[in-house]
């Protein structure tokens, strides 16, 4: 069983990842979900996958979700949501599917916790390539590029 933390769960890669989870419930369990501001979809995902932790990076969206959701999932807001999802003890793999350089810090923190990384954020490798790859080697962490563009960037960064 793989225990997943999905950062960017309401975006294209995040929803596709959750589709795979739904098709293989015997192989995957979602332990954390984080989105930027899509309250409605995140709330639906929380109810369906029942993660231990869920969060919204956008503070006003987070406050609205707090007012709407009263279930057992722990809610986290702001930048702390990214770090909570990246470092949650139960996760064996962290999927980073958020846009831009915002993916660097949670990826670094997940690596430091020994999590396998499913990388769907090319900016993390473009902007933080040497840091990310050296940390992955230091901590013995596997980075799995999620699509062919990321795979090419990943291969390039390891060769330089």
Regions inferred by a protein language model and the residue ranges of each:
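N-terminal Rossmann-like dinucleotide-binding module
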Residues: 1-54
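Residue-level signal for inorganic ion chemistry
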Residues: 10, 46, 94, 114, ...
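Active-site-proximal loop->helix
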Residues: 16-23, 44-45, 125-141, 156-159
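Alpha-helical segments flanking ligand/cofactor-binding loops in enzyme cores
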Residues: 43-47, 83, 108-109, 134
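Short acidic-hydrophobic, aromatic-tinged amphipathic segments that line or gate anion-handling sites
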Residues: 55-57, 74-81
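Rossmann-fold NAD(P)-binding glycine/threonine-rich loop
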Residues: 65, 100-113, 122-142
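Beta-loop-alpha module in the N-terminal Rossmann-like domain of NAD(P)-dependent dehydrogenases
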Residues: 77-110
């Amino acid at each position: 069983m793989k225990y997943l933390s999905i950062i960017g769960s309401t975006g294209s890669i995040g929803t596709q990842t959750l589709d795979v989870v739904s098709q293989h419930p015997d192989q995957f369990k979602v332990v954390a979900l984080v989105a930027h501001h899509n309250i409605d979809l995140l709330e639906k995902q929380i109810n369906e996958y029942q993660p231990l932790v869920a969060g919204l990076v956008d503070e006003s969206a987070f406050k609205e979700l707090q007012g709407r959701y009263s279930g057992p999932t722990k809610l986290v807001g702001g930048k702390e949501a990214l770090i909570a999802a990246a470092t949650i003890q139960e996760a064996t793999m962290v999927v980073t599917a958020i846009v831009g350089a915002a993916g660097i810090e949670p990826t670094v923190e997940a690596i430091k916790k020994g999590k396998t990384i499913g990388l769907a954020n090319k900016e993390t490798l473009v902007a933080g390539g040497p840091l990310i790859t050296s940390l992955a080697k230091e901590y013995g962490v596997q980075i799995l590029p999620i699509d062919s563009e990321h795979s090419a960037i990943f291969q390039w960064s390891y060769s330089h």
